[in-house]
Design a protein with these regions (language model features):
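Short, low-complexity disordered leader/linker segments with a strong preference
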Residues: 1-41, 342-349
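Short, glycine-/small- and polar/acidic-enriched structural segments
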Residues: 28-178, 183-188, 192-196, 215-216
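Alpha-helix/helix-capping structural signal
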Residues: 101, 199-200, 234
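A bilobed periplasmic-binding-protein/Venus flytrap-type ligand-binding module shared by bacterial periplasmic
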Residues: 125-135, 225-242
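Short, surface-exposed acidic
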Residues: 170-173, 274-286, 325-332
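Extracytoplasmic/periplasmic substrate-binding proteins
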Residues: 202-219, 223-224
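Secondary-structure end/capping motifs
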Residues: 238-321
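Conserved C-terminal helix/tail region of periplasmic/extracytoplasmic solute-binding proteins
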Residues: 311-349
Length: 349
């Protein structure tokens, strides 16, 4: 699939691991930062609707962590008619939170993208089935109907990774493009399984009273990189201190949220006006509880350091399934130069 097709398709669905959808606060919505840009001004792009999964950015902004790191932030949610990297490449944003797999696909078109920091340390994808399903492993997907939003973006790549991890071929399963109706389709028995994200789809289904089980796509068998801090190599090289400040303050906020989750809810509420009743607050807290472990990873501490081996495996996998349209060098598409713990990282840019 050509990148232009992917960009159009992801207008409402890109980086689904971040619970994205049509923007609720208007195209290119901003709510913080200075009105005129200076050397320390940084515009941080977030896709589409405000959500507690973006809380590290909200907290770093509202608590002054970005300012303390030496930058003046402007937080910008994409408009519903924007592509995932459109504003970044146009210079309207300096960094964007987006999935590493989609950045790699875009980079294969020759776009100047680089991941300067890890946002999710743990891959959030999972195969979701009814609790009563006979599917208990990825191998059990043989002969089953798997529902996904469409054959593009993170959910699609995760589906192909799940099939491979189960020792299967795509010909062994039926992949149905069902749009963003996974919950209804699974509940109605229209599909046997859906591929979604443990901190979004699975949470929403449980909140809706649907009895489900998850088969995780663990990092050892899933060669994909989820949400990352993405910029252009040109900007990072021209503004190395600002790039480090973004990664440092964002990861500092992750650790602060782990210590006091309420700070995330309070900061998100300034953006998400729906957090005004017990039901919406309960949902946000459930999503947050499922998201904090993704930020922290196995070490229970966020530091922004990325794993070059995982990026290399991902590039090889994406190439094997035919979604890369040119060469992608893992050492170019990701860099640990800007992570606060870079001196301890085993992979270098």
């Amino acid at each position: 699939m050509k990148l232009s097709t992917i960009v159009r398709a992801t207008v409402i669905g890109a980086s689904a691991s971040l619970a994205l959808g049509a923007c609720a606060v208007g195209p290119g919505a901003t709510q913080s930062g200075a009105s005129s840009r200076g050397a320390s001004d940084v515009t941080i792009g977030l896709t589409y609707i405000p959500n507690v999964q973006f809380a590290p950015v909200y907290v770093a902004d509202s608590e002054g962590l970005y300012n303390d790191a030496g930058i003046t932030p402007t937080v910008r949610h994409h408009g519903s008619d924007e592509g995932l990297f459109t504003a970044l490449l146009a210079g309207q944003e300096d960094v964007v939170i987006a999935s590493g797999d989609e950045a790699a696909v875009a980079a294969s078109q020759g776009l100047d993208l680089v991941s300067i920091g890890q946002y999710y340390a743990t891959y959030p994808g999972s195969v979701i089935v009814p609790a009563s399903s006979s599917i208990t492993s990825l191998a059990d997907l043989a002969g089953k109907n798997i529902g996904i939003p469409g054959e593009y973006g993170s959910s699609y790549y995760a589906t192909l990774a799940a099939i491979k991890a189960g020792g299967l071929q795509t010909s062994d399963v039926t992949i149905s493009s069902i749009g963003y109706t996974q919950q209804a389709a699974l509940a109605a028995g229209q599909v046997d399984a859906v591929v979604g994200f443990t901190n979004n789809d699975a949470v929403q289904m449980r909140l809706a009273g649907i009895d489900i089980r998850e088969i995780p796509l663990d990092g050892a068998s899933t060669p994909l990189v989820a949400a990352s801090i993405i910029t252009t190599r040109e900007w990072a090289q021209a503004h190395p201190d600002a790039a480090r400040a973004v990664v440092s303050a964002t990861t500092e906020a992750m650790n602060a949220i782990a210590a006091d989750p309420q700070v995330a809810i309070d900061a998100t509420a300034k953006w998400d006006t729906t957090l005004s009743d017990e039901t919406s607050l309960a949902a946000a807290n459930a999503v947050l509880a499922a998201t904090v472990p993704l930020w922290l990873g196995d070490d229970a501490h966020a530091d922004g350091v990325q794993d070059l081996a995982t990026w290399s495996s991902m590039v090889s996998f994406l190439n094997s399934i035919g979604v890369l349209e040119g060469d992608v060098d893992p050492t170019v598409i990701m860099s640990n130069e800007y992570a606060p713990a870079a001196e301890n990282a085993s992979s270098q840019s």
